[in-house]
UniProtKB/Swiss-Prot annotation:
Heterodimer of LeuC and LeuD. This is 3-isopropylmalate dehydratase large subunit. It holds the Pfam family Aconitase. PROSITE patterns: ACONITASE_1, ACONITASE_2. Its cofactor is [4Fe-4S] cluster. Its EC number is 4.2.1.33. The gene is leuC. InterPro entries: 3-IsopropMal_deHydase_lsu (IPR004430), Acnase/IPM_dHydase_lsu_aba_1/3 (IPR015931), Acoase/IPM_deHydtase_lsu_aba (IPR001030), Aconitase_4Fe-4S_BS (IPR018136), Aconitase_4Fe-4S_dom (IPR036008), IPM_dehydratase_rel_enz (IPR050067), IPMI_cat (IPR033941). It catalyses: (2R,3S)-3-isopropylmalate = (2S)-2-isopropylmalate. The keyword Iron-sulfur applies. GO terms for molecular function: 3-isopropylmalate dehydratase activity; 4 iron, 4 sulfur cluster binding; metal ion binding. It comes from Sodalis glossinidius (strain morsitans). It comes from the Bacteria.
C-alpha cells in the first residue's frame, strides 16, 4: 500500500522507535520567539546543557512588540523582560536572533519562509500553534509546548506519535476575488472547528495547486483552526520558484539534488487516508465569521443562522452563546453590521500579496468616519517591499495606519487591542472571546474584505464594490 505525504515525512525523521514507546523524531528547524522560550532556556541553564545544533534554531521578537516604535519598553514591563530574556538567551547559547533592530525582524511564521529556512521534507517546530503555516512547503510543521522546546534545544529531537490522516480535495477553480482565506474558512465551515482533531490534513486539488505560496501558507496556517495537528501541501514548481535563491535555500548542484528529492514528496496514488473531504472551489463566496470560533462562518451574502438551525445540541448552545457575545441577531445580514476597527496583518495575512490585495481596494477610497484601520506588515522585508511599491502611500492616503512589523492585534498581548464592545474586521486566524481584547468582537475575513469593510464602515461584498 502506498504512503501519504505525511507518512513519508514522518517515517523519514524517525531516529528511534521501540515497542510500546512513542517514536523519537529528528527536528530540522526550530523557530523561537520571546513568549514561550524563556523557561526552556532556563531549563538548559539549570542542567548545564547547551543548544545541540544552534545553527538550526532561529529566534525573533514578534508577539509582544510595539508596532509604533522600536522601543523595547513600549509594551510594558512583562514584554520588555521577555524580549530582554530572549536577547540574553540567544547571545549565551549562540542562537541567531532577529531582534527589533534587525532588518529581517518580523512574525516568526513570516520570516522563516521568506528567508528560505523552511524547505520541503523538513520537520519544523515552534512554541506556537500556527507553526502549521510551514506545511505549505511540504514540511511537517507543528506547534509545541515549552517543555518540548527545551527538549528540542537540548537534543534536536522530539517524541511524537503518529497522527491520523485527512485529505481535503478542493476541485474546480475559485471565482475572481476568492482568496485562500475564503477557501480555508469554507473548509472549516464544512468540517467544523474540531473536524480535523487528531489528524494531519493534506490539501490537494486544482484549486490548491492554483494558489501561490503565500496563499498556501494562509491555508496551512488555519489548519489548526479545524483542530488539525498540521496542514500540508505537496511541493511543486510553485514551491521551487518561491524558494530559489533565498538565503537558506540550497545553491548550485545542491539545489538540483534537493529538487530531485522534493519531487518525491507527494502522496502515492494508492495512499489511504482516514478521512477524505471534497469541496468545489466554484461554490465559495467571500467568507465572514459571525461567531466565536472559525467554524461559525457564512458567505457575506448569507444571513446569520438561528441557533435552532443546528441539530447538534452542543452546536446549538455554542451558537446561542456566540450570538449573545457578538451582539448579533439571527436572520440579519452581515452587510448590515457596522464595525469599529479593521486589522490587516498576522501570520495568516500579512505578506506582500495580502497587502497588495488590500491596497487594491483602498486605492482612491477613504476609511469610513469613526473606523480605525491599521495595516501591519509581517516582516521588515515585507514592509520594505510594500513601500517600494507605494502601497504604504495608498493606505496612508486612504486613512489607514501603516505600522511596524509584529503580531499586533491578532492577540491582546501588546498595545494593539480592542476595547470592550468594539467590533473588528480582522485578517487574523482566531475569533475567540477576548482574543483581540477583553469584550472585543472579532470577525475573520480576507485582506480585501477587511479593506472593503474599512471604507464602507460595515461588512461589504468585494464583488459588489463600485
Amino acid at each position: 500500500m502506498g504512503k501519504s505525504l505525511y507518512q513519508k515525512l514522518y517515517d523519514a525523521h524517525v531516529v528511534y522507535e521501540a515497542e510500546n514507546e512513542t517514536p523519537l523524531l529528528y527536528i530540522d528547524r526550530h523557530l523561537v520567539h520571546e513568549v514561550t522560550s524563556p523557561q526552556a532556556f532556563d531549563g538548559l541553564r539549570a542542567h548545564g546543557r547547551t543548544v545541540r545544533q544552534p545553527g538550526k534554531t532561529f529566534a525573533t521578537m514578534d508577539h509582544n512588540v510595539s508596532t509604533q516604535t522600536k522601543d523595547i519598553n513600549a509594551c510594558g514591563d512583562m514584554a520588555r523582560i521577555q524580549m530582554q530574556e530572549l536577547m540574553k538567551n540567544c547571545a549565551e547559547f549562540g542562537v541567531q536572533l532577529y531582534d527589533l533592530n534587525h532588518p529581517y525582524q518580523g512574525i516568526v511564521h513570516v520570516i522563516g519562509p521568506e528567508q528560505g529556512m523552511i524547505l520541503p521534507g523538513m520537520t519544523i517546530v515552534c512554541g506556537d500553534s500556527h507553526t502549521a503555516t510551514h506545511g505549505a512547503f511540504g514540511a511537517l510543521a507543528f506547534g509545541i509546548g515549552t517543555s518540548e522546546i527545551e527538549h528540542v534545544l537540548a537534543t534536536q529531537t522530539l517524541k511524537q506519535g503518529r497522527a491520523k490522516t485527512m485529505k481535503v480535495d478542493m476541485t474546480g477553480h475559485a471565482s475572481p476575488g476568492i482568496t485562500a482565506k475564503d477557501i480555508v474558512l469554507a473548509i472549516i465551515s464544512k468540517i467544523g472547528s474540531a473536524g480535523g482533531t487528531g489528524h494531519v490534513v493534506e490539501f490537494s486539488g486544482s484549486a490548491i495547486r492554483a494558489l501561490s505560496m503565500e496563499g498556501r501558507m494562509t491555508l496551512c496556517n488555519m489548519a489548526i483552526e479545524m483542530g488539525a495537528k498540521a496542514g500540508l501541501v505537496a511541493p511543486d514548481d510553485t514551491t521551487y520558484a518561491y524558494l530559489q535563491n533565498r538565503q537558506f535555500a540550497p545553491k548550485g548542484d545542491d539545489w538540483h539534488q534537493a529538487v530531485m528529492y522534493w519531487d518525491t514528496l507527494k502522496s502515492d496514488d494508492d495512499a489511504r487516508f482516514d478521512k477524505v473531504v471534497t469541496l468545489d472551489a466554484q461554490d465559495i463566496a467571500p467568507q465572514v465569521t459571525w461567531g466565536t470560533n472559525p467554524g461559525q462562518v457564512i458567505a457575506v451574502n448569507q444571513v446569520i443562522p438561528s441557533p435552532e438551525s443546528f441539530s447538534d445540541p452542543v452546536e446549538r448552545n455554542s451558537a446561542a452563546k456566540a450570538l449573545a457575545y457578538m451582539d448579533l441577531q439571527p436572520g440579519i445580514r452581515l452587510t448590515d453590521v457596522t464595525i469599529d476597527k479593521v486589522f490587516i496583518g498576522s501570520c495568516t495575512n500579512s505578506r506582500i500579496e495580502d497587502l497588495r490585495a488590500a491596497a487594491a481596494v483602498a486605492r482612491g477610497r477613504r476609511v469610513a468616519a469613526g473606523v480605525q484601520a491599521i495595516v501591519v506588515p509581517g516582516s521588515g522585508p515585507v514592509k520594505a517591499q510594500a513601500e517600494a511599491e507605494g502601497l504604504d502611500r495608498i493606505f496612508l492616503d486612504a486613512g489607514f495606519e501603516w505600522r511596524l512589523p509584529g503580531c499586533s492585534m491578532c492577540l491582546a498581548m501588546n498595545n494593539d487591542s480592542l476595547n470592550p464592545g468594539e467590533r473588528c474586521a480582522s485578517t487574523s486566524n482566531r475569533n475567540f472571546e477576548g482574543r483581540q481584547g477583553r469584550g472585543g468582537r472579532t470577525h475573520l475575513v480576507s485582506p480585501a474584505m477587511a479593506a472593503a469593510a474599512a471604507v464602507a464602515g460595515r461588512f461589504a461584498d468585494i464583488r459588489e464594490l463600485n
